């Protein structure tokens, strides 16, 4: 976020916490990208703050990223995590002192989460695969309506096609992304793999190594689809250790993931710290063709 917006986001998080009776003194920004993540102390709550521009209706954007859809996704995220916590799945849950819902202050959408102190950075690949398998088992036990992964692909295709959303994308690169998404999604759908609720982006940045064991966070992009879609977001050493995974399907999903990330980096509204530099890198990886690398290797 731009600095003035980030300051307002922190203030909104403080206000939301105070409104529900949580004491707030110091604040620490844990992550600042398209959504701000801030630790509030001494109540030790993690507030995830979505800016007003992401919540307002934007006719040029695809439905996945429209304001109405984004608010629905935040509500779905809270419900999915609430249900997972109830069946003891490995998740960093919502703060139990706060009603499990989306709060709105000064136009910002805010959700309140339990803070878990990290106890190390690297999770061994075998442990990562095991805890992801455990998460998937927990997800199969809950019944929460989520979008299909193809809804997300279709939204990315719309953004790629829109010169208003991706104005700086060269026409050859626009065609590369459009063709990649079209061809791979058609191949994947024709495989008719078994589907279930998924995390949506279980990459290493969304796994906390805590004293309670590894915990998944950030279910904002939870979708319905084959487990191989989730596996396309994790390092290769992890996906190879996941029991009974179709590695060919994982590879195809990796191409989809690279194309989606590239499209996001070229969006006019993207505020990811890596910016256009990573957008170029992902396009170059796609040009090289299969086998596509995991996104963390680009």
Language model features by range: what are they?
Residues 1-25:
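Juxta-kinase regulatory segment immediately upstream of eukaryotic protein kinase catalytic domains
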Residues 3-6, 10-11, 48-106, 122-134:
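A conserved alpha-helical element in kinase catalytic cores
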Residues 19-41:
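ATP-binding glycine-rich phosphate-binding loop
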Residues 51-62, 106-122, 155-168, 259-277:
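A glycine-centered beta->alpha junction motif in the catalytic cores
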Residues 115-174, 195, 298:
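A cross-family kinase active-site recognition segment
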Residues 194-199, 204:
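Catalytic-loop of the protein kinase fold
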Residues 196-197, 209-254:
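Active-site Asp-x-Gly
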Residues 236, 244-298:
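Helix-rich C-terminal or lid/interface subdomains of diverse kinases
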């Amino acid at each position: 976020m731009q600095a003035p917006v980030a300051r307002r986001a922190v203030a909104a998080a403080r206000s939301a916490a105070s409104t529900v009776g949580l004491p707030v003194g110091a604040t620490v920004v844990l992550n600042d990208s398209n959504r701000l993540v801030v630790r509030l102390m001494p109540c030790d709550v993690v507030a995830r703050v979505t800016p007003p521009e992401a919540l307002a209706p934007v006719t040029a954007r695809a439905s996945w990223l429209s304001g109405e859809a984004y608010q629905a996704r935040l509500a779905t995220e809270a419900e999915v995590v609430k249900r997972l916590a109830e069946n003891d799945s490995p998740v960093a849950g919502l703060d139990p002192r706060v009603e499990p819902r989306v709060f709105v202050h000064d136009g910002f959408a805010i959700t309140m989460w339990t803070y878990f102190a990290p106890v190390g950075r690297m999770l061994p690949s075998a442990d990562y695969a095991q805890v992801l398998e455990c998460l998937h088992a927990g997800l199969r036990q809950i019944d929460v309506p989520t979008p299909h992964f193809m809804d997300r692909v279709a939204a990315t295709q719309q953004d790629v096609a829109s010169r208003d959303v991706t104005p700086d994308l060269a026409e050859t690169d626009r065609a590369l992304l459009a063709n990649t998404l079209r061809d791979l999604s058609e191949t994947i759908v024709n495989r008719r793999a078994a589907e279930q609720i998924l995390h949506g982006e279980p990459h290493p940045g969304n796994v906390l190594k805590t004293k309670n064991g590894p915990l998944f966070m950030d279910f904002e992009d939870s979708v319905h689809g084959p487990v191989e879609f989730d596996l396309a977001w994790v390092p290769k050493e992890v996906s190879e250790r996941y029991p009974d995974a179709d590695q060919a399907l994982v590879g195809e999903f990796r191409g989809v993931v690279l194309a989606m990330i590239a499209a996001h980096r070229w969006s006019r509204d993207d505020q990811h710290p890596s910016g256009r530099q990573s957008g170029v890198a992902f396009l170059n990886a796609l040009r090289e063709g299969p086998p596509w690398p995991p996104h963390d290797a680009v």
